[in-house]
Every structure is written in structure tokens, then in C-alpha cells.
């Protein structure tokens, strides 16, 4: 174990609350084209193209810039949703969970579920803008919203497209997804990392340990979150008629069968796998170098 790892094991270090959001922004900048293709696939009518066909179509019709449609909204989402859920989870771990129980899922799961719920609610408005901006170019010209950026999107939705009701469209499935994502992504990362270190003798300070644990966490998170993710995309991309989530679900099951809830699993994992690896890698690097922390804490 490295000197830094030994020191960390010996005392309860309180890292800055914004590490999760900063790491999320970094991961988003890299994986945004994959997320864009995933959203387009989830909203597209049948028959659906493959992930790579969708990326090829976006590149051919919209150019390289098109691959980053809605990037400002995606960054805003990380500043809200990811910052809140990671920050709240770490805060609860530091102040609520007994030190000897930091790898006990009976303690971790409730903390992660609460953190995911408030993160999903806090980031809902950014999620609505994000999904609409990503899918805008795929719509007919007359139906496009043409938001200039995330702030313009928030303003236009609030001013002209239904106000807060529209900005919080889909908040219930988004909170459910936040709960599922945080529980399946953050908790499983902690559990897998602990298992690799204590059972398989991985070095807790090494990048390969972090990347292995995060890859496994991404696999679990994609599978657990797929149904809520598909529902969230369809609700938030709606035209504003505010149909109940259960009606949208029933219509989709009737027309497409129950398997629609896992539609886009592969593109979701193709995006969420690398995203999860990058976000935890970035968090571990921020912690390793104590970025933004007072000198006496370094």
C-alpha cells in the first residue's frame, strides 16, 4: 500500500463536495457523442438502427459538431445531478455511517438511495433541456426547439413552454433513476473495490484497481437503470401534453412489448461503462492529489 493510501486509512479525510461534479464533467466531455446516440436510439421509432449506424448518421447529416449537440445541457446536468448525488453520498458516509461499516451495503444502500433521489430532483430541469437538445436535430424542422444553449433552453421552457411544470416533467422516473443509478453505480464501486483489495490482493492505490471496479459497477448500473432510463427519455422528450408515466408505459408495452425497457442496453453500456470508469478514475485522481484542499490537509 502506498504512503498516501496508508495515511488515508489512518484518518477520516473529508474531501471537497464538488469532486463528483467535476469528475462528471470530465467524463461527459469524453463520452457525450455516445450519450447523444443513446438518447436518439431510445426516442427513435421502430425499426431502430444500431449505435454505430446512429453515430454514422449524425456525423453524415450534422458533422462533427453534431456529435456534441446539447453539450452545454449535459455539463449543466453534471453540475446539478451528479454534484448533488455524489456530494450527498460522501457527506452521509462521513457523518452517518460508522467507520467500521463503510463497506456494509446495509448502510451504504439507504444513503445512496437518498442521495440519488435528491440528485435526480435537483438535476431534473437540466435533464429535460439535455434530452431535448440532444434529440432536436432528429426532429422535423417545424418541430425543432432550437435552443442556443442550456441556459437559453431553461429560459424558453420556463417562459414559453409550460414553466416549472415542463422543467420538472418526468421528475418521478428521474428520481427513481437517480436512486437506481446511485445505488447500483456508487455503492457497487465501493463494494467491488473493497472486494478486489481485501479478497484478491489488488493495490487500493493503483489505477487498474479503480478501472476494474468501475467497469463492473458500470455493467451493474446499466442493467439496473435501463427501464427507468428509457421511460425518462420518452417522457422528457414529449411534446408537452404531460401524459402520465403509467400511460406511456402501457402504450409502449402494448406496441413494442416488455423488451422495450431494455432497448438501447448495448449503447447505454457503451456509454455508461466508459463514463463510469472515467468518473471514478477522475475522482480517485482528485483525491490522490487532494485538489482544492487546504495545504494542512494534503
UniProtKB/Swiss-Prot annotation:
Name by which UniProt lists this protein: Mitochondrial dicarboxylate transporter
The family database entries (PANTHER family) matched by this protein are listed as: MITOCHONDRIAL DICARBOXYLATE CARRIER-RELATED (PTHR45618)
Enumerate the transmembrane spans: 17-37, 58-76, 105-126, 170-189, 211-231, 265-283
Q: Which GO biological process categories is it annotated with?
A: dicarboxylic acid transport; malate transmembrane transport; oxaloacetate transport; phosphate ion transmembrane transport; succinate transmembrane transport; sulfate transmembrane transport; thiosulfate transport
Q: What Gene Ontology terms describe where this protein resides (cellular component)?
A: mitochondrial envelope; mitochondrial inner membrane; mitochondrion
Among SUPFAM superfamilies, the record links this protein to: Mitochondrial carrier
Protein family: Belongs to the mitochondrial carrier (TC 2.A.29) family.
Molecular function per GO: antiporter activity; dicarboxylic acid transmembrane transporter activity; malate transmembrane transporter activity; oxaloacetate transmembrane transporter activity; succinate transmembrane transporter activity; sulfate transmembrane transporter activity; thiosulfate transmembrane transporter activity
Its source organism is Saccharomyces cerevisiae (strain ATCC 204508 / S288c) (Baker's yeast)
Q: What is its main location?
A: mitochondrion
What is the protein's known function?
Mitochondrial dicarboxylic transporter catalyzing the exchange of dicarboxylic acids like malate and succinate for inorganic phosphate. Required for growth on ethanol and acetate.
Q: How does it assemble?
A: Homodimer. Binds to the TIM22 translocation complex during import.
Q: Which Gene3D superfamilies match?
A: Mitochondrial carrier domain
PROSITE patterns, per this entry? SOLCAR
Which cysteines are cross-linked by disulfides? none
Taxonomically, which superkingdom? Eukaryota
Which membrane topology term applies here?
Answer: Multi-pass membrane protein
Q: What is known of its domains?
A: The C-terminal Solcar repeat is required for association with the TIM22 translocation complex during import.
The alphabetized UniProt keywords are:
Antiport, Membrane, Mitochondrion, Mitochondrion inner membrane, Phosphate transport, Repeat, Transmembrane, Transmembrane helix, Transport
Extent of the Solcar repeats:
11-95, 103-195, 205-289
What are the subcellular locations of this protein? Mitochondrion inner membrane
The miscellaneous remark of the record is: Present with 3390 molecules/cell in log phase SD medium.
Amino acid at each position: 500500500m502506498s504512503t498516501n493510501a496508508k495515511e488515508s486509512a489512518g484518518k477520516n479525510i473529508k474531501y471537497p463536495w464538488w469532486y463528483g461534479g467535476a469528475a462528471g464533467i470530465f467524463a461527459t466531455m469524453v463520452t457525450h457523442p455516445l450519450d447523444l446516440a443513446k438518447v436518439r436510439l431510445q426516442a427513435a421509432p421502430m425499426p431502430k438502427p444500431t449505435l454505430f449506424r446512429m453515430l454514422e448518421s449524425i456525423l453524415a447529416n450534422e458533422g462533427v459538431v453534431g456529435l456534441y449537440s446539447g453539450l452545454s445541457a449535459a455539463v449543466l446536468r453534471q453540475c446539478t445531478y451528479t454534484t448533488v448525488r455524489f456530494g450527498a453520498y460522501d457527506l452521509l458516509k462521513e457523518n452517518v455511517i460508522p467507520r467500521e461499516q463503510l463497506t456494509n451495503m446495509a448502510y451504504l444502500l439507504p444513503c445512496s438511495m437518498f442521495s440519488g433521489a435528491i440528485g435526480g430532483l435537483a438535476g431534473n430541469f437540466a435533464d429535460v433541456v439535455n434530452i431535448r437538445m440532444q434529440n432536436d436535430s432528429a426532429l422535423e424542422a417545424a418541430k425543432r426547439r432550437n435552443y442556443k444553449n442550456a441556459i437559453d433552453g431553461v429560459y424558453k421552457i420556463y417562459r414559453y413552454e409550460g414553466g416549472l411544470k415542463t422543467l420538472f416533467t418526468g421528475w418521478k422516473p428521474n428520481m427513481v433513476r437517480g436512486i437506481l443509478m446511485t445505488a447500483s453505480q456508487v455503492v457497487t464501486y465501493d463494494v467491488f473495490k473493497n472486494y478486489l483489495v481485501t479478497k484478491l490482493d489488488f493495490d487500493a492505490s493503483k489505477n487498474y484497481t479503480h478501472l476494474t471496479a468501475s467497469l463492473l459497477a458500470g455493467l451493474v448500473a446499466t442493467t439496473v437503470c435501463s427501464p427507468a432510463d428509457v421511460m425518462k427519455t420518452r417522457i422528457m422528450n414529449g411534446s408537452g401534453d404531460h401524459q402520465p408515466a403509467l400511460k406511456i408505459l402501457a402504450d409502449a408495452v402494448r406496441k413494442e412489448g416488455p423488451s422495450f425497457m431494455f432497448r438501447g442496453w448495448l449503447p447505454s453500456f457503451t456509454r455508461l461503462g466508459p463514463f463510469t470508469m472515467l468518473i471514478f478514475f477522475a475522482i480517485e485522481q482528485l483525491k490522490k492529489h487532494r485538489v482544492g484542499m487546504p495545504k494542512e490537509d494534503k
